[in-house]
Design a protein with these regions (language model features):
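Catalytic-loop of the protein kinase fold
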Residues: 165-167, 172
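Glycine-rich "substrate-gating" loop/helix at the edge of Rossmann-like oxidoreductase active sites
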Residues: 87-89, 164, 190-196, 228
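ATP-binding pocket architecture of kinase catalytic cores
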Residues: 1-165, 178-182
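Regulatory N- and C-terminal appendages and interdomain linkers associated
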Residues: 266-307
């Protein structure tokens, strides 16, 4: 992740987000892309902070950075959102669904993001990118990852032409919530955003909710009774998204889920490698490598048993 700082000045409060120091993997930590996408979304139905300035001069603080608005609100880390009641939880999940559908309905030409990524063949390109990054940061042999990569290569659906702006890390704790209302005031952490397939974002969020409850930053709802919490089932959440976007049916759902597990595992491997090399921004980074194998195993279980 990119180191983030809260700045208090005479003129107000701001947030500075910069690239981490040290040697970086190619295309990782693109704070300039984060700045560009949030700036482009200012007047859309996707809530984002106001952007102030991107500094590409690495001599100022040691790496590229940008300054954005400080949003006063709430961040929730636990997918079960124990801090609120059932009615609020139901409303919050519906709000996340609404914002995701709004994001995928953004006219990328109108907001100046038509060249923000390569349109088409998203999963093929992503498989290439994350397989390469996984190999570059591989520390030891993990058979489940080998099996998963082989399955994804052999079961990739034909490109259906769907292209939208995708966030790339769309989940509860990457949103700033209104101080009292079940309303998103800012979607944050856009470093993985690009032009891609909208179902990648939807499957990624659903994948996260399949995680164990004690998944650290990736705490999910595995084993929890969603109904008793006022949280929709995966099927209900997907259905609500489809209704918002006028989609009849989703084919190949198990592929999209399995791909999400793979990509997250590849990202985790990169974090673990940076920790080993001494470049990670979080003290917890070294432990992240331990999730790679379980993620690949969960994906293979979906593949074997169906979504």
């Amino acid at each position: 992740s990119n180191p983030t700082f809260h700045i208090k000045a005479a003129s107000g409060e701001y947030v500075l987000r910069r690239q981490p120091p040290g040697k970086l993997l190619k295309s990782a930590h693109a704070v300039d892309r984060e700045f560009r996408v949030m700036n482009a979304l200012q007047n859309t139905d996707v809530p984002v902070p106001r952007m102030y300035h991107l500094c590409e001069d690495r001599d100022v603080v040691g790496s590229m950075f940008y300054i954005m608005e400080f949003c006063q609100g709430r961040i929730f880390w636990d997918a079960a959102i124990p801090e609120v009641d059932n009615a609020q939880r139901t409303a919050m999940y519906d709000e996340m669904n609404r914002v995701l559908a709004a994001l995928h309905d953004v006219d990328v030409d109108a907001v100046g993001l038509a060249d923000y990524g390569k349109p088409g063949n998203y999963f093929e390109r992503q498989m290439g990118r994350w397989s390469k990054q996984y190999r570059a940061s591989e520390i030891n042999h993990i058979q489940a990852m080998e099996d998963l990569m082989a399955w994804l290569e052999n079961n990739q659906p034909a490109d259906d032409g769907q292209v939208s702006l995708v966030h790339g890390d769309y989940r509860l704790d990457n949103m700033m919530w209104h101080p009292t209302e079940p309303r998103v005031i800012a979607v944050l952490d856009w470093e993985l955003s690009t032009l891609g397939h909208p179902l990648a974002d939807l499957a990624y969020q659903c994948m996260q909710l399949r995680m164990p409850q004690e998944g650290g930053n990736l705490s999910g709802l595995q084993g929890k009774d969603r109904k008793s919490l006022g949280i929709p089932t995966e099927q209900e959440y997907v259905q609500a998204y489809c209704e918002r976007r006028g989609i009849d049916h989703i084919d190949h759902w198990e592929f999209y889920l399995a791909f999400s597990f793979f990509r997250l595992a590849a990202i985790a491997q990169g974090v673990a490698k940076r920790a080993q090399d001494g470049n990670a921004s979080s003290k917890k980074a070294a432990a992240v490598g331990q999730v790679v194998e379980p993620l690949a195993q969960m994906a293979m279980q979906i593949v074997r048993e169906g979504a």
